[in-house]
Amino acid sequence: MTVPGHRGERLADRIRVEVAEIISGELKDPRIGFATVTGVDLSADFHHAHVFVSVLGSADAQQKSLEGLISATGYVRHELGSRLRLRRVPELAFVLDHAAEENERLETILRELKNEP
């Protein structure tokens, strides 16, 4: 859960934007597919951040992308530190976000229910 308060929300949003730019523009790992950073949850002390990522593709492709992101965590954190100028850069933990898949599944169910007589 993101830290309540304006500073926590702003920092989480900045981390989300910067990590998304780093992933899309600088990471060259072939395991990482089309990944979208969907959100960031910060701990209360700003020392830990869960970065939620949605990846297109099969479950195997998603897992490989997650492995690629995890292996690039040190680089992403270093780049984040140089961009944000924080006293202490949060430890990053990448997590697959299945919300988009769940939304698609629910929309399919609702369409089917709507089309039933």
PLM features: residue spans?
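Charge-rich, low-complexity N-terminal segments
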Residues: M1-H48, S54-P117
